[in-house]
Swiss-Prot record:
One of its GO terms (molecular function) is cobalt ion binding. NCBIfam families: NrdJ_Z, PRK07562.1. 5'-deoxyadenosylcobalamine (coenzyme B12). Its EC number is 1.17.4.1. It catalyses: a 2'-deoxyribonucleoside 5'-diphosphate + [thioredoxin]-disulfide + H2O = a ribonucleoside 5'-diphosphate + [thioredoxin]-dithiol. This is Vitamin B12-dependent ribonucleotide reductase. The active site is at N474, C476, E478. The keyword Oxidoreductase applies. Disulfide bonds join C199-C487. It is an enzyme of class 1 (oxidoreductase). The keyword Nucleotidyltransferase does not apply.
Length: 1254
């Protein structure tokens, strides 16, 4: 083949006109800990910090790269393509630590990728001469550096490591078909033939243990997950529940095996340690177990709700039952007899009313009877990574139902539908098609699964129908082909071809890229190895490719075209038609030189029919299609905003058909539209795949850490395209992003602040904090100005300042309306709705997938997403990965209508995601106001007898008094001589010393942390962190707040723990420290790996009648560290005048003494004798429930105006993420709440991780 140079010059480096810079790549956890850091990284100057971080963190090879290399001469290969190996002689001259290094330059990565492709292309005979090979090598490197295109992640991981660095290792059970002999060969090297494929479809037969069967599939899936790829399978061949087995007996059914596969996938994070397994499960709609399958995730979500709610109800009532026993003033066993203990009787009735099992109630009473004062009952939450979700099944795959047209027509006519046995083919059940359709609609509405595969349409466009039907897809549903095949992907960045100045899309440049990258992907098939024999053979036989694009949403906005418009859809259709037409034309050209794919001859008639149908759509024909059940949406020739795109598209398809009829095709498929998650970040795409944008204001990462707000770069370009003046554009931008200053702010500005008592110095402080503030309240708080200033200068009392949810601006007299107006001016509206100068008819140009900002109301409709997909689908070999976002108030009928429209517009697949359909996702608004909870409390109070009402009201009065005491308290100084304990341990190979200091009553008041032989910086940070925690404890911050914030944080050092009797593994130093403190001071044995007390109600006991011993524990607690004894004093002996008594630390009061209700703090009971002592015990129980707005104020500002994060809770971080336009879920790799929906998957904007395979 001849290769044209379009971007490079013969004899010049492809990087000659590209500036490069050095940067530091760093990714941090939300708590500030470093996940990854690499210095002196060389990247193109125009690359963003996020693109640089993703390249450095994910795609740089960090091990085994020899510092000295030498070329291996090959006679038949041009010298510039000779591969390299380590130069052992030169390496021996270097210090041992310097011999093997990491890749540090983007040029190294571009060179190894393009060099490897060109090397194999040369050996495969793809180039006419040396000059063509050199041009191919140079053009590819230029395109990669300019972010014009990117291959899928496995190419970045694996391709060129053997060619560029001589990295090698023994085979891992992979296979390839030798391109020169055509023979299936087992790989002897793990690297010589790279594994560049991201997407796999695997078959599974109705066989338990043999090759190709059920258990074999889990092994094959594990091999793919390990290397970072995704896989999908159709399980419809598996027998339904109750079907006969060949050896006698009955089948356990489809679902039993799907649950095994789900557990296996959940145990393996895709890529070994990087992300969850990417997996697709498909079941045909006529399978006997289809109803159970459709309801699978719905019922599992219900189980999560039951676990969460039930655990809270059980804990509440069981603790109340135990408390009624412990606080009883009766004698002997009377306290444990509900007939003699009215309080116990009442609590048992309440527990039964809440359906707490009688057996458990009885168990707790027996537990109390043995002398125990508290019970540990785990409470679950709806967090995606919580124990509740880990307990249920069905959470590790995308589930789809495969529908044929006869089912959908039965839905339209209200016909019957038969479910058929797998073996006998007999009808096992007949039901109404609409009833099953209703189940599908409800399940999608309630749990976001199943998605749908429109199987008839998929197979109508199938190029190789003679070789079998398409039955499944990869996890993201863009690759659809025969079982046991694979596809390697690459995506073009459409925006790089658009010239903003000339308002013209470079069609020729786009065609040039499509041609070259068809060759790249074809060469990748030739050089690849595969995880099984079948996949190796069929991938060689059909040679499927997956070229696609990204940034269509960014391109449309830049051009000033609404995503939901005829022009936008026509442009999308034309660009897609050009791409696939050129790829098939190129495939035919390769076939003329190297021959067709081996399966072509058998399928020539089917393939040419499909190509003719593609061509008809490109020529705008509405009918005349061959053998299609549903006609596609043809190219809109009139509405396309750039006429030459239409003519190029039609010419490409004319040539593709003409050359194909003459030479055949090298590839059975050539294009898909993938979600482009991680690779979209490497290309700095505003939008991924075919998606619109998700927000107009983005948070751009800085090289030194932190973020700053910027307008989406497409917005000013769109405004210029729409004819706005630069001054108007500047004002619209400032409206969206904010002015970052008090200057000219309405309501709140320098003059109004001075009138309220603010000094010039205070105003200067807040001005410094405002440019990076997400909300004005983040800057106007006590951490910016200091409590002394607010109290002394502004005259606000200490009690008000310390109150939860304290709002300084409201406290000094500003109204909510004034605050909101100032907030929009200073911090930005995060939307252009309501912006000055912007005409209402231009609003649709800036519509996103979700409403933007706090005041944004507009977002793209469900139908607009589906119609955009329909505009592209007729020109795609495979399908489109996309999830349709639906608002929270969407109905089941809306879901069914969306699916029905998708079928009628000839889509091959679709999936829906209704906002709030997962329990783990936070709602955008509160269901009912807090005061309605108070109404419920009043109603329940009136239901009780007068004595109980009096007791409850009195308790509330005490509670308020206690709370007031707590709120008003100043710093509680530690005693000069204090007790505590020192714990030495080794965490992940690093020595850690934890020392505690306690108040006289045993409460924790300070901690010291030291790390043995660590660097000065880390030791200093850890020491100062301990001081900060100690100050918080002394000012009344409950220990459980720290425990909740810092347990389960992840950063190095981490790993096994030695030297601690309770903690055996920690995910970080902070995780270890706060687990230890929680176990020792809060009796949080759920955070321990070994229970130090074994004080469960089924334990053997201590050998004494614990409930009848004298109360001596409160004396002993003043003499011994509560932490050292793990909050237990039952093993202490108090000597008094020669007599011995067993001290029961938390026992009941002696008979005859006054009894005050004990106020327990997180499992550590405390006998309280008066209100003040009650306040001390109760302070850790005070729950500062914040509103969503208050939760956002977790960001605190230091006196310098710099943001200081006190690690807000997950709920707080979710709320902020939702406000910024993210999904509100946490990235499982870096812990940041920056996930955006990406096709059927999710993508992290911080670290680049995806839940899919690109």
């Amino acid at each position: 083949m001849r290769i044209e140079r379009r971007h490079t010059t013969t004899g010049q480096s492809p990087y000659a006109g590209i500036d490069f810079r050095l940067t530091t790549s760093e990714i941090r956890n939300p708590d500030g800990s470093v996940v990854f850091k690499l210095d002196n990284v060389e990247v193109p100057t125009e690359w963003s910090q996020v693109a640089s971080d993703v390249l450095a963190q994910k795609y740089f090879r960090k091990a085994g790269v020899a510092a000295r290399l030498k070329k291996v001469e090959e006679e038949s290969v041009p010298s510039f393509l000779w591969r390299s190996v380590p130069d052992t002689e030169a390496l021996s001259q270097l210090p041992e630590k310097e011999r093997y290094v990491s890749e540090l330059s983007a040029k190294q990565v571009f060179d190894r990728l393009a060099g490897c492709w060109t090397y194999w292309g040369w050996k495969g005979g793809y180039f006419t001469n040396d000059e063509d090979a050199q041009a191919f090598y140079d053009e590819l490197r230029y395109m990669l550096a300019m972010q014009m295109v990117a291959p899928n992640s496995p190419q970045w991981f694996n391709t060129g490591l053997h060619w560029a660095y001589g990295i090698d290792g023994p085979g891992q059970g992979h296979y390839y078909v030798d391109p020169f002999t055509g023979k299936l060969t087992k790989s002897k090297s793990a690297y010589e033939h790279p594994q560049p494929h991201a997407c796999f479809i695997q078959g599974v037969g109705d066989d338990l243990v043999n090759e190709g069967g059920i258990m074999d599939l889990w092994v094959r899936e594990a091999r793919l997950f390990k290397y970072g790829s995704g896989t999908g399978s159709n399980f419809s061949r598996l027998r339904g529940e109750g079907e006969k087995l060949s050896g006698g007996g009955r089948s356990s059914g489809l679902m039993s095996f799907l649950k095994i596969g789900d557990r296996a996938a959940g145990a393996i994070k895709s890529g070994g340690t990087t992300r969850r397994a990417a997996k697709m499960v498909v079941v045909d709609v006529d399978h006997p177990d289809i109803e159970t399958y459709i309801d699978w995730k719905v019922k599992e979500e219900q189980k999560v709700a039951a676990l969460v709610t039930g655990s809270k109800i059980n804990q509440k009532h069981l603790k109340a039952v135990l408390k009624a026993c412990v606080n009883c003033e009766g004698s002997g066993d009377d306290c444990f007899d509900p007939e003699k203990n009215p309080a116990l009787r009442r609590e048992i009735k309440l527990a039964r009313r809440s359906l707490v099992p009688d057996n458990y109630i009885k168990r707790v009473i027996q537990f109390a009877k043995q002398g125990y004062k508290d019970i540990q009952f785990d409470v679950y939450d709806t967090d995606w990574d919580s124990e509740a979700y880990l307990t249920v099944s069905g959470q590790n795959s995308n589930n789809s139902v495969s529908l044929k047209d006869d089912f959908l027509r039965a839905v339209e006519t209200d016909g019957d539908w038969n479910l058929n046995a797998r073996t006998s083919k007999k009808v096992t059940k007949t039901l109404k098609a609409r009833d099953l359709w209703e189940k599908i609609g409800y399940a999608a509405w309630a749990s976001a699964d199943p998605g749908l595969h429109f199987n008839t349409t998929m197979n109508d466009w199938h190029t190789c129908k003679a070789s079998g039907d398409i039955r499944a897809s990869n996890p993201c549903s863009e690759y659809m082909f025969l079982d046991d095949t694979a596809c390697n992907l690459a995506s073009a960045n459409l925006l790089t071809f658009y010239n903003v100045a000339t308002k013209h899309f470079d069609v020729e440049g786009y065609e040039h890229l499509c041609r070259l990258w068809t060759v790249v992907l074809e060469i990748s098939v030739m050089m690849a190895q595969f995880p099984s024999k079948a996949i190796a053979e069929l991938s060689y036989e059909f040679r499927t490719l997956g070229l696609g694009y990204a940034n269509i949403g960014g391109l449309l906005m830049t051009m000033g075209l609404p995503y939901d418009s005829k022009e936008g859809r026509a442009l999308c259709g034309a660009l897609t038609a050009v791409m696939t037409g050129i790829t098939y034309k190129t495939s035919a050209e390769i076939a003329a030189e190297l021959g067709t794919f081996p399966g072509y001859k058998k399928n020539a008639a089917h393939m040419l029919r499909v190509i003719r149908n593609h061509r008809r759509a490109a020529h705008g024909q509405s009918n005349g299609y061959e053998a299609l059940s549903v006609n596609p949406v043809p190219l809109d020739l009139v509405s396309c905003p750039q006429a030459d795109l239409v003519s190029h598209a039609q010419a490409a398809w004319d040539a593709a058909l003409e050359l194909g009829e003459k030479h055949g095709y090298r590839n059975a498929q050539t294009t898909v539209i993938a979600p482009t998650g991680t690779i979209g970040l490497v290309m700095d795409c505003d939008t991924t795949g075919i998606e619109p944008d998700f927000a107009l204001v983005k948070f751009k990462k800085l090289a030194g850490g932190g973020y700053f707000k910027i307008i989406n770069r497409a917005v000013p370009a769109a405004l210029r395209a729409l004819g706005y003046r630069e001054s108007e554009i500047a004002e619209i931008e400032a409206y969206a992003v904010g002015h970052g200053s008090l200057s000219n702010a309405p309501g709140i500005n320098a003059s109004t602040l001075k009138a309220k008592g603010f000094t010039d110095e205070a105003i200067a402080k807040v001005e410094k904090a405002l440019p990076t503030a997400f909300d004005i309240k983040f800057a106007f708080n006590k951490w910016t100005f200091g409590e002394d200033f607010i109290r002394d200068q502004l005259g606000i009392g200490a009690e008000a300042i310390a109150a939860p949810g304290f709002d300084l601006l409201q406290a000094v007299g500003f109204t909510k309306r004034e605050i909101e107006a100032a907030n929009v001016h200073i911090c930005g509206a995060m939307t252009v709705e309501g912006a000055p100068h912007l005409k209402a008819e231009h609003y649709p140009v800036f519509d996103c997938a979700n409403p933007c900002g706090k005041i944004g109301k507009r977002y793209l409709s469900v139908e607009s997403h589906i119609r955009m997909m329909a505009a592209a689908q007729p020109f795609i070999s495979g399908a489109i990965s996309k999830t349709i976002n639906m608002p929270n108030d969407a109905t089941v009928e809306d879901c069914k209508s969306a699916y029905m429209l998708s079928w009628k517009l000839a889509l091959k697949a679709n999936a829906l995601y209704r906002d709030g359909s997962k329990l783990s996702q936070p709602l955008n608004s509160q269901l009912i106001a807090d005061d309605e909870d108070e109404d419920d409390a009043v109603e329940s109070l009136y239901e009780k007898p007068m004595a109980a009402r009096t007791a409850q009201v009195s308790e509330k009065i005490v509670e308020k008094l206690v709370e007031r005491i707590i709120v008003m308290r100043e710093r509680e100084k530690m005693p000069d001589r204090r007790k505590g304990y020192t714990q030495k341990a080794v965490v992940g190979g690093h020595k850690v010393y934890l020392r505690t200091g306690e108040y006289d009553d045993g409460r924790l008041g300070e901690i010291f942390i030291d790390m043995h032989k660590e660097g000065a910086a880390l030791r200093s940070f850890i020491n100062n962190f301990a001081i900060a925690v100690s100050l918080g404890l002394q000012y009344g911050v409950p220990l459980d707040e720290y425990v909740d914030a810092f347990t389960f944080t992840r950063f190095e050092p981490a790993g096994p723990v030695q030297g601690n009797d309770s903690i055996k593994y920690a995910t970080s130093i902070l995780d270890y420290v706060f687990r230890e403190l929680a176990v020792s001071y809060m009796s949080r044995f759920d955070l321990a790996h070994v229970d130090p007390t074994e004080s469960n109600f089924d334990a053997l006991g201590k050998g004494v009648e614990e409930g009848k011993e004298p109360d001596e524990g409160h004396h002993a607690s003043k003499l011994v560290s509560r932490g050292l004894t793990r909050s237990r004093t039952d093993n202490l002996v108090v000597m008094r005048g020669g007599s011995t008594a067993v001290a029961q630390g938390n026992d009941s009061a002696p008979s005859g003494g006054s009894k005050v209700t004990a106020l327990a703090s997180h499992g550590a009971s405390a006998r309280v004798g008066d209100v003040l002592e009650g306040a001390v015990a109760l302070k850790q129980e005070v729950s500062h429930d914040l509103s969503p707005t208050e939760k956002l104020e977790a960001l605190q500002w230091s006196k310098s105006g710099t943001a200081q994060t006190l690690v807000p809770s997950k709920a707080e971080r979710r709320a902020e993420a939702k406000a910024k336009g993210y999904e509100g879920e946490m990235c499982s790799e870096c812990g940041n709440f920056t996930l955006v929906r990406n096709g059927t998957c999710m993508k992290c904007d911080t670290c680049g991780s995806t839940t899919g395979c690109s």
